[in-house]
């Protein structure tokens, strides 16, 4: 929906074939999944025709294992409805790009079947053509992605709760205490 034909051929086709693994970098330590709370910034360097990415993301599913990442970052400010808001854009970042590293594996209480890691960007230079969609349209991309993902996470949480309830009921029925 958002990518150019070149981006779709280069990234989407190998992802769809299962030849590559992808990850989505939105969540940040101080903002969670609030796209307007993002601190990660991308500044365009006209001299090199590159975006320079600085910041970090946390709790990123497939974080260390993905080959390609969609990363949400602030690219400026824009006036909307009479007030200044952050301009949010989305970028395609490939694993191995200089300035892109991983933090430690995140420790979680639940949904431990997926490895989540911190993504760190320090003067990470990505080509101008790796802007996904149009500049300033990253908020739409983030919301579209979250809309699809939230139902899956809710289903997982419901399944975990149901499993915990069933296990508890079985335990209570079999438990012996005070001679009963």
Predicted regions mapped to residue ranges:
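Buried hydrophobic positions in well-ordered alpha/beta secondary-structure cores of metabolic enzymes
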Residues: 4, 24, 42, 53-55, ...
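Short Gly/Pro-enriched turn/cap motifs at secondary-structure boundaries
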Residues: 30-33, 59-62, 81-83, 108-115
